[in-house]
């Protein structure tokens, strides 16, 4: 199960994300899970929870500020309207949030699917402090 958290993007504006923690109290590697073009929907929340079940501290930054859709045309419009620099800023904020968490081991990676895969590539180029970068496109 995920919980909604508020945090700051790298540049300081407030943003939100879904977080799932692994069982127990041990420190765990962190994963930034970047959404698909549908938004941070139930599927992304489920993936966040499943990754936590595998022992990761997971955060899924909400790049659409709460908007989700099931309609491909609307998803395309949301993706086209996405400001890539702002999204990378949000991913950087998620990385910083993980690194500041007492549950995080200090290792942080980023992964994503579809649009999230492309954003993971952008983050790999522009977000310092990542331990690993994986994309599924």
What are the residue ranges of the model-derived segments?
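Catalytic beta-strand/loop cores that center a nucleophilic Ser/Cys/Thr
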Residues: 2, 14-17, 110-111, 125, ...
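Short glycine-enriched nucleophile-adjacent loop
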Residues: 117-128, 133
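Alpha/beta-hydrolase fold nucleophile elbow
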Residues: 102-114
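Conserved small/polar residues in nucleotide/adenosyl-binding loops
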Residues: 136-137
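Serine-hydrolase catalytic machinery in alpha/beta-hydrolase-like enzymes
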Residues: 4-103
């Amino acid at each position: 199960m995920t919980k909604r958290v508020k945090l700051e993007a790298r540049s300081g504006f407030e943003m939100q994300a879904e977080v799932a923690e692994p069982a127990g109290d041990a420190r765990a590697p962190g994963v930034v899970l970047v959404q698909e073009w549908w938004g941070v929907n139930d599927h992304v929340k489920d993936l966040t929870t499943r990754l936590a079940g595998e022992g990761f501290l997971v955060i899924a930054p909400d790049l659409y500020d709460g908007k989700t859709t099931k309609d491909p045309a609307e998803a395309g419009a949301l993706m086209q309207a996405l400001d890539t620099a702002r999204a990378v800023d949000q991913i950087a904020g998620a990385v910083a949030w993980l690194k500041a968490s007492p549950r995080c081991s200090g290792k942080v990676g980023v992964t994503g699917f579809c649009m999230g895969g492309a954003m993971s590539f952008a983050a790999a180029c522009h977000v310092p402090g990542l331990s690993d970068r994986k994309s599924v496109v």
